[in-house]
Amino acid sequence: MDNERIKDLGEKELIIRLSKYMPKNQTKDDCASLSIAHENLLINTDLMVEDTHFNDKIIHPKDLGWKSVTTNYSDLISSGCVEFIGINVGLIINPETKWHWIKEFYEGAYEALDYYGGVILGGDCSKGIKNGISITAIGLQGKLSLRRYSSRPEEIIITTGTHGLSRLGYLLKRNKTNKDLSKLSGKLISQSLNSFQRPKPKRDFLQNIIKSRLSTDQIEIGCTDSNDGFYQAV
């Protein structure tokens, strides 16, 4: 086992092995819930690496800044976040990167925070061969506890959007659809590119969940973000 490499394990197996060092169910959701002074904090971290998750050929740095915030925000609201406090930004930057790229990235992040609430709380940076971005988002949990492990067999699954649009947008940007683009409507292409480059989590999601409850005593509901795909989410 000492000779095993991470690339041979895969993400799922790595998480399973690391979960034994964490509290029960800690790896079941995208956010950790911490009780502090009668409030629960929701904390989520996403990491993106150049040429693995992004590059300048498929996404503009301003769109990348927006997306970095909104993907984290989506994780928070799907865990019951009622107030988006803000983000910490960790950057690994190649010394040859132009300032303009960094500026555009932060402008995109600021636009997203201006739209959804929250501020840039701080962060850190270092140099590396390829650019990397780590965003830690923090929010306050409301009365509802939305956790993936609260789901039960035979319950109805409800989604808040159309799955596959972001993936199609990604493939379109990379010219890897293997499809005749003339068969795709202009509306579908536009929706797919917007979903990939400028995803917009639904801010009224939590309020709609509250309205749909059969009982006001029900505080735990099975829920998760599906940024990684519907199959992965369930």
Over which residues does each language-model region extend?
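Helix-biased detector of long, well-ordered alpha-helical tracts
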Residues: M1-V234
